[in-house]
Amino acid sequence: MEGKLVGRTALVTGGSRGIGKAIAEGFAKEGAQLVINGRDIKVLEASAQHIRETYGVPVLPIAADVTDEYQVKMMVAEAEAFGPVDVLVNNAGVHIASSFLEYTFMDFKNVIESNVYSVFHVTQAALVNMVKREYGRVINLASTAGKWGSRNQSAYNASKHAVVGITRCLALEMAPHNILVNAICPWVVDTDMAKGFMSEHSKALGVGEEELAEKMNASTPLGRLIKPREVAGLAVYLASDDASYINGQAWTVDGGYTMI
């Protein structure tokens, strides 16, 4: 089999749906064997079977809560036994929109734990063996929300700024070990999570979901949301040897939104 990732094993958190699933399929298309993580084993197994049948690569589904240090260590150990983890994609996360004054502490804590602590736990566990092997690629899914502020998204924006910060610090620490660390910062991607975001955000702004969707589409030069495969293509590039001199970058994928 030919492909840019033949002989590599990739671990993708949140890999059973949305952006994570698209990235997993992009990796599989290039020949990587996969470990996909999520919380729902039935959804994971269905996604794994689809990838096996479509691309003919080995796929190991592992259900684990990536905010739980013990579960993460067990997951990474199982992934390493399946095939040394060469590429890690931290994609798992949540989004809760609310005005700052109405945010509950538990909701704020949930966002930070899901979007930041998960990156800490999974990356730290995976890096141990990457350092021993003197090779690795870490790709963190951040967001354009990790580059500026926006209304009703204080927790989410804070979490994604943290992910970008972790990415840049690790890029410096891990470079001597031939481990590259980069982030992808998409605008709104057309996924189920985005639909939930639109619903929450429309309520927080006091406008209808359809009206908000029209405004969002009109706010970007391309006039539409991002397709998951458009994020996956960049992840494939960053995981490959084509990107062997790219490190510590937070790649914006927004159709030109930030130019306006």
Feature roles, as predicted:
Residues 9, 16-17:
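Conserved glycine-rich cofactor-binding loop
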Residues 41-42, 63-75, 105:
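The beta1-alpha1 cofactor-binding region of Rossmann-like NAD(H)/NADP(H)-dependent oxidoreductases
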Residues 99-100, 104-112, 216:
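Substrate-binding pocket helix/loop in short-chain dehydrogenase/reductase
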Residues 120, 127, 135, 222-253, ...:
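C-terminal substrate-recognition "lid" of short-chain dehydrogenase/reductases
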Residues 123, 159, 167:
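Active-site helix of classical SDR
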Residues 143:
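Residue(s) in the substrate-gating loop at a strand-loop-helix junction
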Residues 175, 180, 246-248:
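Short, small/polar-rich loop/turn modules that mediate ligand/substrate recognition or access, typified
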